[in-house]
Amino acid sequence: MSPDRLTPFYDKLPEMTRSTLAEVMRYLTLWIVFRDPPQHTRLRTLVNKAFLPGAINGFRPEIERITASLLDRLQPDSELDLVADFTMPLPALVIMGMMGVPENQLHNIKSWSDDIMLFVGSAQNTSEKYERARRGAVEMSEFFRAQVRARRAAPGSDLLSLLIAARDEHERLSEDELIATAMLLLFAGHETTTNLLSTAVLALMRNRDQYERFVRRPELAGTAVEEFLRYDAPASAMTRIVRMEHEVCGKPLKIGERVFAIINAANRDEEHFEKADALDIARNPNRHLTFGQGIHFCLGAQLARLEARIALPMLLTRFPEIAPGRDEPVWLDALIMRGLKSLPVRLGTSRV
């Protein structure tokens, strides 16, 4: 099985559509998540150190600062979209800070990511989505080329500077790989964590006993986050391309076929999880498959865990009476990602 699900799809598109998507493919085919060894191994080795638990734990004070700042902007007893006002900006600002990207670029980062997502995971099949994906990839790549020029003139200690040093000193990645990796880290560094935080709050509102349990016992954050990851995974499936004919459970698989491994189905397997359809924030053990397995295990798993373990208790401690808003939640139109486009809530009173 190969993770490169983009190339076979791209090759089957009409010539005009392929022309539109040429710049998108220029960068996305270089993303670690779509590459096989040895290219995958080389790129992963370059960025692994920045995402080891010891390095990630060093960002705890900054994550706490960003979380507190966002919570301070929320008005008690108001009705708002929690995605727009909290669960999206939090992980976006964290990864932007890690990469040395100015906070005033938040709107652009979100816009570019949304455009690229239309190609990576949207269920839509329209010409507009391809043009938007092209625009998002071009504008994000141009932004990072400017950032790279600035870092070369004045290097820092941020993640982008470390990638540039690896590129310039050892020539272990091309200039396009440098830009593509920066794009991936920024894109993946906030999209799935936004989904995790949003669906966690939704799950708690729909399971009030667990909500009240979490408010009473915020020390359960560790097991609670693992349960949110299992109960409604932020990426609902992994896609692979068949490289050689074989069978899985008696099902013949032919070269070039796409295989969707549905994570959320595995995470509700009654043979592995007692009362699998129930939300239990103290569930332990909890060997879910949300972060994947093997060489493609999620690079940002520790960062996502840390952000959620900090943000959710801080949110519920500040606003212990969050309830559904008047409007219904709006889900993302996506094949792979599982998250909310908007989550209307009523905050209730504040403890601060």
Model-derived segments and spans:
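Cytochrome P450
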Residues: 1-352
